């Protein structure tokens, strides 16, 4: 496969993944996304109060279960709240704010696919192998689903992919400063 065809296929797969994930994130019902309603309490709290929640606060705690996702790491909720705050400048629509919050997962999934292609390019001499790796990871049904709703998982997969990529680069360059910093 020549270089031009490879990059065309790679960018089309990345764009296709983004379109599928973003499109699904727009139409996915909250009740079909596990715990999303409860996870959404965190970015909603951040946007409305302009402060980080304490997990013991009533407004972020589930009354039936008695716990809150604010007791867990919530970096993705902070990122989602930025997208929600930007969206709230234009509209107060609950659907638009939900889609804005889901954008964190969509972009994390898309970023993961980009990094998987970079990993494939580092590991394999043949471009087809890198392309196949991207196809396998990017179009696993569960991965596409994780990239469509508010959760920590898609961002966690993205950061692990980044760690693996820079680890591979570091091993190839004897961990020069550039590869250690990223």
For each predicted feature, which ranges?
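Start-transfer (signal-anchor) and selected internal transmembrane alpha helices
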Residues: 1-23
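Transmembrane-helix signature of polytopic, membrane-embedded enzymes
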Residues: 8-14, 92-95, 116-139, 157-158
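Helix-to-loop transition at the C-terminal end of transmembrane segments
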Residues: 22-37, 153
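Extracytosolic helix-loop segments that constitute the early lumenal/periplasmic catalytic or substrate-binding loops
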Residues: 38-71, 75, 85-88
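Juxtamembrane segments of multi-pass membrane glycosylation machinery
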Residues: 68-71, 75-107
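Transmembrane-helix motifs of polytopic, lipid-linked glycan transferases
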Residues: 99-124, 162
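Membrane-interface transmembrane helices that cradle and orient dolichyl/undecaprenyl
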Residues: 121-128, 163-181
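Short acidic/glycine- and proline-prone juxtamembrane loop motifs at membrane-interface regions
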Residues: 142-155
């Amino acid at each position: 496969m020549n270089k031009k065809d490879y990059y065309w296929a790679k960018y089309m797969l990345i764009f296709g993944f983004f379109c599928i994930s973003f499109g699904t994130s727009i139409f996915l019902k909250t009740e079909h996304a596990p715990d999303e309603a409860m996870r959404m309490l965190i970015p909603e709290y951040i946007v409305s109060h302009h402060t980080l929640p304490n997990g013991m606060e009533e407004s972020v705690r589930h009354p039936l279960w008695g716990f809150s996702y604010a007791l867990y790491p919530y970096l993705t909720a902070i990122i989602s709240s930025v997208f929600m705050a930007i969206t709230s400048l234009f509209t107060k629509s609950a659907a638009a704010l939900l889609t804005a919050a889901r954008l964190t997962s969509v972009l994390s999934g898309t970023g993961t696919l980009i990094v998987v292609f970079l990993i494939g390019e580092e590991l394999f001499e043949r471009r087809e192998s890198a392309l196949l790796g991207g196809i396998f990871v990017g179009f696993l049904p569960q991965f596409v689903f994780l990239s469509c709703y508010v959760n920590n998982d898609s961002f966690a997969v993205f950061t692990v992919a980044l760690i693996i990529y820079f680890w591979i680069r570091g091993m190839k360059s004897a961990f020069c400063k550039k590869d250690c910093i990223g």
